[in-house]
């Protein structure tokens, strides 16, 4: 119960665009079969239909779409992609309500029916398809409706080629070329002129007035459609203007405006601070400074002996005062001298509240006065 199909599927350039090829699956068996298609590269191919039913002695065309590649493959590239067509005989099973043949396949497989496989190898060809010219003629002819030619039977009988009444343009052209060759070779059977005349007169060409009428009707329809579009655009623009004016009125009337506070004027010129006063006569200041300096230098030698004399007197008086503080007799011990220097406190406990510290003898007042005078003179003369 296997199906019949070609063992190779050829794809032709260009591969940067989507390629479409057909697989003809034929059922030579006396009973119907179901099939499904599998591939080793599901991301590269799209199969329509990928499952279905084939009646006895019938053929189903399976469309295979190859996704576009980023660049053309190398000339020596070998494609390893494959397709697998599985078939299964279903006998008298009812498939009138079957929508998904994959589920129906699963049900039949559970019944233990035999499965037959047919493998198809993909081939990327570097040459153009051999029937590309035929396909181009076919695409050109299918764009125009078939023309019914009267007297084609007579033409066919005269040249020995069977032709249908509703012959297409390409078949009529082939028959005409065959008749021409046949006549040029000296065949005695000559087609009468009336036959050719009736043949070409049957292809009625529409009158120019009819064509003009059709063109006029088309122009009128286009003009009416254009007027409708213009009317709709004008209506929409008017509606937009009305809505815009209403929104502006709401903004002007209902939204409160912020209170405007007076702004202080800010001067653009920066403030100018007056420079410090500069003495007008610098020479007078310099002369005054030089005069004071000369006076100080002249007084300094005169005051130096007096300062030395005062310092000598101060030193002698200081030594005498320190010597007078010592005991007259040298026989006193250091302990007695320390006891004299230490402060004495009253021994009477009753007078402890009124007791006072007895101070040791210090620097005499006259020495303090002399020291103050010396420091005053030094500060006056040198500072």
From Swiss-Prot:
SUPFAM superfamilies, alphabetized: PapD-like
Keyword Transmembrane helix: yes
Keywords assigned by UniProt, alphabetized: Endoplasmic reticulum, Membrane, Phosphoprotein, Transmembrane, Transmembrane helix
Disrupted gene: phenotype observed: Leads to the dissociation of the cortical endoplasmic reticulum (ER) from the cell periphery and its accumulation in the cytoplasm, in particular in the vicinity of cell tips; when scs22 is also deleted. Affects contractile ring assembly, contractile ring anchoring and displays severe cytokinetic defects; when scs22 is also deleted.
Keyword Endoplasmic reticulum: yes
Membrane topology: Single-pass type IV membrane protein
Ranges of Polar residues composition bias in the record: 127-146, 347-359
Principal location class: endoplasmic reticulum
Compositional bias of kind Basic and acidic residues: 241-263, 289-300
Region (Disordered): 127-160, 233-359
Transmembrane segments: 363-383
Domain of life: Eukaryota
GO MF: endoplasmic reticulum-autophagosome adaptor activity; endoplasmic reticulum-plasma membrane adaptor activity; phosphatidylinositol binding; phosphatidylserine binding; protein-membrane adaptor activity
Function according to Swiss-Prot or TrEMBL: Vesicle-associated membrane protein-associated protein (VAP) implicated in maintaining the cortical endoplasmic reticulum (ER)-plasma membrane (PM) attachment. ER-PM contacts function to modulate the distribution of contractile ring components to ensure robust ring assembly. ER-PM contacts function also in controlling exocytosis and maintenance of cell polarity regulating cell shape. VAPs play an important role in regulating eisosome assembly. VAPs also contribute to ER-phagy by tethering atg8 to the ER membrane, but also by maintaining the ER-plasma membrane contact.
Record note on quaternary structure: Interacts (via MSP domain) with duc1 (via FFAT-motif); the interaction is direct and serves to restrict the localization of duc1 to areas of cell membrane-endoplasmic reticulum contact sites, and away from the cell division site. Interacts with epr1.
Entry-linked PANTHER family: AT11025P-RELATED, VESICLE-ASSOCIATED MEMBRANE PROTEIN-ASSOCIATED PROTEIN
Domain topic, free-text comment: The MSP domain is required for binding to the FFAT motif of target proteins.
Family, similarity comment: Belongs to the VAMP-associated protein (VAP) (TC 9.B.17) family.
Identification of the protein by name: Vesicle-associated membrane protein-associated protein scs2
Organism: Schizosaccharomyces pombe (strain 972 / ATCC 24843) (Fission yeast)
């Amino acid at each position: 119960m296997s199906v019949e199909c070609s063992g190779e599927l050829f794809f032709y350039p260009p591969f940067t665009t989507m390629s479409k090829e057909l697989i003809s699956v034929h059922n030579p068996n006396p009973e119907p079969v179901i099939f499904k298609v599998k591939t080793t590269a599901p991301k590269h191919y799209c199969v329509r239909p990928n499952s279905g039913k084939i009646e006895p002695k019938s053929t189903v065309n399976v469309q295979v779409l190859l996704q576009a590649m980023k660049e053309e493959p190398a000339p020596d590239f070998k494609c390893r992609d494959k397709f697998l067509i599985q078939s299964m005989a279903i006998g008298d099973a009812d498939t009138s309500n079957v929508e998904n043949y994959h589920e129906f396949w699963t049900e039949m497989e559970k019944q233990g029916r035999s499965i037959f496989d047919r493998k198809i190898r993909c081939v990327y060809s570097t040459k153009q398809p051999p029937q590309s010219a035929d396909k181009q003629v076919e695409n050109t002819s299918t764009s125009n409706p078939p023309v019914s030619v009267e007297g084609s039977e007579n033409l066919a009988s005269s040249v020995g080629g069977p032709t249908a009444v509703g012959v297409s343009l390409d078949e009529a052209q082939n028959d005409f070329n065959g008749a021409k060759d046949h006549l040029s070779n000296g065949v005695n059977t000559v087609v009468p002129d009336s036959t050719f005349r009736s043949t070409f007169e049957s292809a009625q060409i529409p009158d120019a007035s009819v064509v003009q009428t059709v063109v006029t009707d088309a122009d009128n329809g286009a003009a009416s459609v254009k007027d409708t579009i213009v009317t709709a655009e004008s209506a929409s623009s008017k509606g937009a203007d009305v809505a815009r004016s209403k929104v502006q009125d709401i903004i002007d009337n209902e939204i409160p405006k912020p209170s405007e506070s007076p702004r202080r004027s800010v001067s653009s010129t920066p403030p100018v601070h007056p420079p410090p006063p500069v003495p007008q006569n610098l020479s007078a200041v310099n002369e005054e400074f030089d005069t004071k300096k000369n006076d100080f230098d002249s007084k300094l030698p005169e005051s130096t002996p007096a300062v030395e004399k005062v310092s000598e007197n101060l030193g002698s008086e200081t030594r005498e005062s320190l010597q007078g503080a010592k005991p007259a007799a040298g026989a006193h011990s250091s302990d007695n001298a320390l006891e004299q220097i230490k402060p004495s406190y009253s021994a009477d406990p009753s007078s402890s509240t009124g007791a006072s510290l007895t101070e040791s003898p210090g620097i005499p007042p006259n020495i303090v006065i002399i020291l103050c005078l010396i420091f005053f003179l030094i500060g006056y003369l040198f500072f």
